[in-house]
Amino acid sequence: MSIDYSDMAFPKPARKKKKKHHKATILKSRKGICYLCARLNGDYRTKVTEEHHILFGSGRRERSEEAGLKVDLCIPHHRTGQQAAHNCREMRELLCRIAQREYEQTHTHEEWMALAGKNYL
């Protein structure tokens, strides 16, 4: 017993998901070089890096992407170390201060407040 599938509307044609094209980072961050290692220690060696969204959580990650508020961080500075951006409030706020300074060079303070909801300067 075989079924003729030729006149059935299946499988449905796959719909491609549209990719969002986000701005490049507004901070001077290069792929493979940890932003914090370079800024704090002068270490410009190539490392395994992960993209860190400076504003994250409750829909702010997408807005962070659109505004270019992201940097490449090595794994210890991103999630595992004592001074990791996800573990250390001082490091997270340092990144937010730097990002706010850069953002406000081309935008107003009111635009930053609408985006981030907090003043870090």
What do these predicted regions represent?
Residues 1-48, 93-121:
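A boundary/linker detector
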Residues 6, 26, 56-57, 81-82, ...:
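Alpha-helical and His/Cys-centered functional microenvironments
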Residues 19-22, 58-59, 88:
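Residue-level detector of alpha-helix boundaries and kinks
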Residues 21-22, 52-53, 77-78, 86, ...:
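Histidine (H) residue identity feature
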Residues 45-46, 61, 86:
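Short glycine-/acidic-enriched loop or helix-start segments at secondary-structure transitions
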Residues 49-57, 74-81:
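Histidine-centered catalytic micro-motifs
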Residues 55-70:
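Short linker/helix segments within small regulatory modules
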Residues 70-94:
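Short Cys/His-centered divalent metal-binding micro-motifs
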